[in-house]
Each structure stands twice: as structure tokens, then as C-alpha cells.
């Protein structure tokens, strides 16, 4: 397996990171995950635009142009012969010696890019059957719009969900539902798609954006606004979404069944529309439902 370290492809076991890299010591960096179908990137520009936007919000300069970055990632994908899978990439602020919370102003650090690509098939069964989630207080910082390497709050919530055999932890600040530990959450109520506004309390998911676009295109009303735990529990349908899980229905919340416990009709339609977008961009999907 080859991985990318700056502009070099190296064997996974030969890849190294400096112990005083600020990403390693502080989580000082940003990242993205881009999906591949039939060897082609899906919503690539949207992901990379968000990467550069996240970097700008923390005054981090990515040492490659968008064109240079794409060429590097395409080489990575080709070298590993990825058909359906994920590309994880991150950029840290670079190495600072000695370690210091304060970013140096006397010389610019050179950002460090790393990336890896892996074959990850679509989970058709999960897209149809869905699964349970739990709710958990959102204890993360207040700039969740930045796709930062600082993920400890997400990790703790996701691990708690895993320990309870749940797909996800739905995060909430008091009564206000925000998102999940590694995905966005949406509800359907009276035929309306309802999801949290794209503000500082959530990451504006790329899959979330595609879902909103296809909903509007196909006449499904969309409401981007706060909703509560009560709204969540009284919803007609609930689903989670992300680059890696596409649109996955929620069957139970904290052990309580959602409606009839099956994927709802609007959720199914939205996933159909979403798959159509993938097919248009990347070609036909084997076993797509």
C-alpha cells in the first residue's frame, strides 16, 4: 500500500511524521474524506473547497494549489488501484521545535500533507435496514464548522455508541440537536426534510448539501433550522448522512423505535435521488438500490 507524504508516494511502512509536528502534538490541522465510485471522485471540488476553507479559518496555508493537490491524489488512487473507496487526507501546520502553543511569527511553518486511499465497498444492507442511535450531550468546541483534527469529543461519543451497539451518537446542546459524532442528522416531519442550519455548531456535510439540493429539485420541502430532542423523537422518519454512509435510516433512538422501525418512504426517495447523482458523476453502481 502506497501513501502520500507531501508530494511523495511511499510505502505505508516507510511513512514517517516528525514527533514535533503540530498536528501530532496539538491536533493543529484540517482534514477531508473524499469518496470514490468506479475509480472516480464524487463531489471532489466541494470537499477540497471545504478543506481550503477550513484551513483559512485557522490561518493555515496549504502548500499546494488545488490543481497540484488533485494531481497528487489521483496518483495515490491509481497507485493503489482503488475502485470504490475512501481517500483520507490531512494538512497540519507543520513542525515547530521547540513545542509551543503560540504559532511562530518570525518564520512560516511548512504545512505537512498526508493521505491514504483504501478500498471500502458500499454497505447496501445498512442503507436499507439502518440501525439504532443513542443521544449524547454535545461537549465539543464551538467551531464545529471547521473540519479540524481535534476530534476527542467526537471519539468519546462515537465510542459510547459503539459500546451500546448503536450506529451513531446524536449530539445535542441542551434540548437542541446539532449533528452526530461522525455524520449529520435529519428528520422528516409531515413531509418536510428538517436539518440543522449550517452554522458554527455543525459541519456542513457535503452529503448533507447534496441531499438538500436533490430534495429541492424533486419538490420535497426543506427546513434548515434548529430542532429539539422532542422533535427528533416525534419525527416520522430519521436518517443520518455522511460521505462514507451515504443516507442511512435510523430505526431506534435510545432504544425507542422510530415509527415502524423501517426506512421511511421519503428517506428511500432521497437515497434514490442521491444514488442518481453518483451515477451521473461516476457511472453505474453495481447492486445500487
Curated annotation (Swiss-Prot):
A GO molecular function held by the record: pyridoxal phosphate binding
Known EC number: 2.6.1.21
BP GO terms, sorted: carboxylic acid biosynthetic process; D-amino acid metabolic process
Cofactor(s) essential for the protein: pyridoxal 5'-phosphate
Keyword Transferase: yes
Alphabetized Pfam families for the sequence: Aminotran_4
Residue list for modification N6-(pyridoxal phosphate)lysine: 147
Entry's Gene Ontology cellular component terms: cytosol
UniProt protein name: D-alanine aminotransferase
Biological classification of the source: Bacteria, Bacillati, Bacillota, Bacilli, Bacillales
Amino acid at each position: 500500500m502506497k501513501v502520500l507524504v507531501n508530494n511523495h508516494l511511499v510505502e505505508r511502512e516507510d511513512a514517517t511524521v516528525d514527533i514535533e509536528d503540530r498536528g501530532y502534538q496539538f491536533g493543529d490541522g484540517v482534514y477531508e474524506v473524499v469518496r470514490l465510485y468506479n475509480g472516480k471522485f464524487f463531489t471532489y471540488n466541494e470537499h477540497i473547497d471545504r478543506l481550503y476553507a477550513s484551513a483559512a479559518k485557522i490561518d493555515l496555508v496549504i502548500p499546494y494549489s488545488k490543481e497540484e493537490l488533485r494531481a497528487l491524489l489521483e496518483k495515490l488512487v491509481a497507485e493503489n488501484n482503488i475502485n470504490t473507496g475512501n481517500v483520507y487526507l490531512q494538512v497540519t501546520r507543520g513542525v515547530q521545535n521547540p513545542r509551543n502553543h503560540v504559532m511562530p511569527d518570525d518564520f512560516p511553518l511548512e504545512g505537512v500533507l498526508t493521505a491514504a486511499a483504501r478500498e471500502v465497498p458500499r454497505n447496501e444492507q445498512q442503507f436499507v435496514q439502518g440501525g439504532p442511535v443513542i443521544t449524547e450531550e454535545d461537549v465539543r468546541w464551538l467551531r464545529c464548522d471547521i473540519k479540524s483534527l481535534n476530534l476527542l469529543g467526537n471519539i468519546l461519543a462515537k465510542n459510547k455508541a459503539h459500546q451500546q451497539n448503536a450506529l451513531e451518537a446524536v449530539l445535542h446542546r441542551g434540548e437542541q440537536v446539532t449533528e452526530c459524532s461522525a455524520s449529520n442528522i435529519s428528520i422528516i416531519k409531515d413531509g418536510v426534510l428538517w436539518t440543522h442550519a449550517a452554522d458554527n455548531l455543525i459541519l456542513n456535510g457535503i452529503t448533507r448539501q447534496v441531499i438538500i439540493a436533490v430534495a429541492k429539485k424533486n419538490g420535497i420541502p426543506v427546513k434548515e433550522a434548529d430542532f429539539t430532542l422532542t422533535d427528533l423523537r416525534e419525527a416520522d422518519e430519521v436518517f443520518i448522512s455522511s460521505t462514507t454512509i451515504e443516507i442511512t435510516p435510523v430505526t431506534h433512538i435510545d432504544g425507542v423505535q422510530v415509527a415502524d422501525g423501517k426506512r421511511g418512504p421519503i428517506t428511500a426517495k432521497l437515497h434514490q435521488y442521491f444514488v442518481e447523482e453518483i451515477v451521473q458523476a461516476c457511472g453505474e453502481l453495481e447492486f445500487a438500490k
